[in-house]
Amino acid sequence: MSRYDLVERLNGTFRQIEQHLAALTDNLQQHSLLIARVFSLPQVTKEAEHAPLDTIEVTQHLGKEAEALALRHYRHLFIQQQSENRSSKAAVRLPGVLCYQVDNATQLDLENQIQRINQLKTTFEQMVTVESGLPSAARFEWVHRHLPGLITLNAYRTLTLINNPATIRFGWANKHIIKNLSRDEVLSQLKKSLASPRSVPPWTREQWQFKLEREYQDIAALPQQARLKIKRPVKVQPISRIWYKGQQKQVQHACPTPIIALINTDNGAGVPDIGGLENYDADNIQHRFKPQAQPLRLIIPRLHLYVAD
């Protein structure tokens, strides 16, 4: 497929996402809103977009106000739709839930509508990340050349739909991206970097090359069977825990956007019990279960690369 054809498909798919989201928000407003609860988080400014989040103050919204915020959030796809001071790199998050009363027919209609939106979003992400054939650093420029101001993460994010929950609870998750590597795999990566000299601010080209050579020597000095691990922290994120009484099971979802809960009164379902979201405080985290951590020694800080002792 030619690059021109891919761009045509990219634009066409995005227009469909916009149209289907507009139709969904109109459709939802035709249904009876049983309960709505969303939690707005402080906006991240451009100056603070890379700063760690030690505290997050939550503001709760209920009822029709919550619904209006949520429906607007689903269609928030461009930086032009937000304050000039807000970071375009930090994700815009609005955890919460909208609960609508449905019957069998309207439940199926909404399920199909949301499934179609999620399919389009997945297709759009596939075009950008796979079909474009571009490295991650070049994708931003390519996408924004054709869709100026697009917040790509908001375009990728699928909608979470649940049916007849008994309880919904919200909380925070601290996670790490973890990847296990062999010594030879790390050496191979460093060789590639050494073969393509460049400057990385604040270092000059020569300083950066020297830094890479030191890193290579440090890794080469390890035993071949050394266990290496990338353990990179991810910014804290809101989550939801859904309890289904009939199935006696709990399901956890990431919750960057409001969940859509359909309550089917034809099947005798009732309004779920919905909890709040507490302010986040990194110094006051309570772990339900924290397994014994493997002893690790940081060896290349910029890569978050550790060696198991």
UniProtKB/Swiss-Prot annotation:
One of its GO terms (molecular function) is DNA binding. GO terms for biological process: DNA replication termination. GO terms for cellular component: cytoplasm. The keyword Cytoplasm applies. Keywords: Cytoplasm, DNA replication, DNA-binding. The keyword Oxidoreductase does not apply. It is found in: Cytoplasm. Trans-acting protein required for termination of DNA replication. Binds to DNA replication terminator sequences (terA to terF) to prevent the passage of replication forks. The termination efficiency will be affected by the affinity of this protein for the terminator sequence. Belongs to the Tus family. NCBIfam families: rep_term_tus. This is DNA replication terminus site-binding protein. The lineage of its organism: Bacteria, Pseudomonadati, Pseudomonadota, Gammaproteobacteria, Enterobacterales.
